Amino acid sequence: MENEQPVIPVQARFNSIKAFFVLLVRQFNEDGCRQSAAALTYTTLFAIVPVMTVSFVVLSSVPALQGKSAQLQEWAFEYFVPSAGNMLLDHLQSFAKQATNLTVLGIVFLVVTSVLMLSTVEQTLNRIWKVQTPRKGLVSLLMYWALLSLGPICLGLGLAITSYLTSQAIFSDTVSYLGGVRLWLAVLPFLFTTAMLTLMYTVVPNTTVPFRQGVLGAAMAALLFELAKGAFTFFIKQAPSYQVVYGAFAAVPVFLLWIYISWTIVLGGAELVRALVVFQEHQRQVPRMHALVRLLNVFWQRQQSGKVLRSKEIRQVMQESGISQWDEFRNLLVNANLIRRTDEGGYILSRDLRNISLGQLVAMLPWPAHTQLRVRQQPESLPWEQALKSRMDEAREGMMAPLDISLDALFSAPSAEKERHPEQQGRND
């Protein structure tokens, strides 16, 4: 049959799923997500009042939401915080209302505190995506302000829809055609949480994050958040002894613990997004060393013609190797002073490849030896790639002499220039 699809053996599918979760757990541990969640917990403790104050200001600027700040915060706490932390809401609202009476200098301090929290979140997500250069200047401030503005507005929209559905359930049968008010009241907060996390996962990191994987990771994090909230509430109800120990301050450690759990879930979702991207690319990509030398070859060609390689072109070059690897490669090559960024935003070689041998390149890289020396042979491999594989195979057998060749000499293998997409060279020239 022409329409028959190849059947993936159950064992192969199981091994693939197992490898994915191994990758996810390894990334979570290597990126220090638990330590980052702890740091964000304390940052949140200091920034929660400024963020609530900013939400007061944002909501008061929207005519339809004026006077709804207290109701919105109660609704947000009811959804996002287990019942054990609700007793803190009155105190936080009191602090936030008092903060609205501050002077201009005090308001600037609150805004700066809120921005610093978002900056910490950006740094954490950039570390997950292996990005070393955060956004700077006006672009960064605009993104932070957009997040501070959209968050309260999205919550306000959720509150408005919830109120509308509740009123429709009382006065008409409209909601029954849509599946019932209880179903929608349960689903809507989940959808808004997914939307906000999608915004965080795809917009905050200073790199290109695929939207589809961002939505999948956000939905999974929102689901885990719901499960964790139920489990946490059940635990608190079944183990009330903490109230005997802490007394009137019992809500504080419980609230801190919940913030830590929430940030752990959020960062776990970010790791899931990256794992989805990396694992999908890993299924079809060439080995990292091969991909890196390919990228250097493109830089070398541009150097020969005196041209700059732009980020958009680099991502096109790395489409087969895996776009997500560009951030790691850029960091490695910049730190090794092999490439540098131009004022126009492109990248060029900063060293003469005649003075750098293949062995020196291998020594610069932090990857394990078995990873560095792997090169994939393909039917369309260019002459220099065939020479690279031959030399790497000999090096894997313990003979390091084949690596004593400059990168310039490697790329100048016979017929290499003729074989490399002559139509593209014609356009570049």
Curated annotation (Swiss-Prot):
Annotated Gene Ontology cellular component terms: plasma membrane
Keywords: Cell inner membrane, Cell membrane, Membrane, Transmembrane, Transmembrane helix
Membrane-spanning residues: 45-65, 102-122, 141-161, 184-204, 216-236, 256-278
Pfam families for this protein: Virul_fac_BrkB
Membrane protein topology class: Multi-pass membrane protein
Compartments where located: Cell inner membrane
The keyword Cell membrane appears for this protein: yes
InterPro entries: UPF0761_bac, Virul_fac_BrkB
Keyword check for Transmembrane helix: yes
UniProt record similarity statement: Belongs to the UPF0761 family.
Protein's name according to its UniProt entry: UPF0761 membrane protein ABO_1543
